[in-house]
Amino acid sequence: MKMITGVSKMCCDGVIQYLEKEKIPILIKNRHTCLDLNDSNMYVLKKGIVKVSLIMQDEREFNITYLQGLDVVSLYCDCLTQFRDCHPKIRIESEQAELYCISKEKFYKRVKEDANLQNYVDTYYRNRLKLAITREQVMIMNSKAGAVCSWLY
């Protein structure tokens, strides 16, 4: 079975070039620090590992995935919460993580103007949907071991 990855390196390079050109500040967060996703900023993981989870209405935490290296953490959380009434939680799992912090308004304005960034966002959502569907197929079609293996895959 072919492994599905987030987005192509070329698209990621375009996002990094934009962030560096605009001189977007880099935040350095320490292990077990949580990000506040209710503010008006977007976070792009540059280095490190973060855990993405959802806080359900009854306050249980449901772990979704771990993200490593370059990834738009806020887009991933937007994917998760678009159709659910739950709150995303992002926690730093590496010793330190470096994240770009940009205003959502500024980012989406730039996405509308730049075809490369628009392509990145579209590809990101499409690939995340493919990954979710593939994991669900493996879980549904297999036993308990298959369910565990689908998340390790």
Per-region residue spans from a language model:
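Cyclic nucleotide-binding regulatory module and flanking cytosolic helices
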Residues: 1-33, 72-73, 77-80
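His/acidic/aromatic-lined binding-pocket segments of jelly-roll/cupin-type domains
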Residues: 25-27, 34-36, 40-46, 63-65
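A short beta-turn/loop motif at secondary-structure boundaries
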Residues: 33-37, 139-142
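Glycine- and acidic-residue-biased ligand/ion/polar-headgroup-sensing regions
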Residues: 40-53, 58, 69-71
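ATP/adenylate-binding site constellation spanning eukaryotic-like Ser/Thr protein kinases
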Residues: 47, 69, 104, 126, ...
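Cyclic-nucleotide recognition modules
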Residues: 65-123
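Polybasic "coupling" helices that flank or enter modular domains
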Residues: 115-153
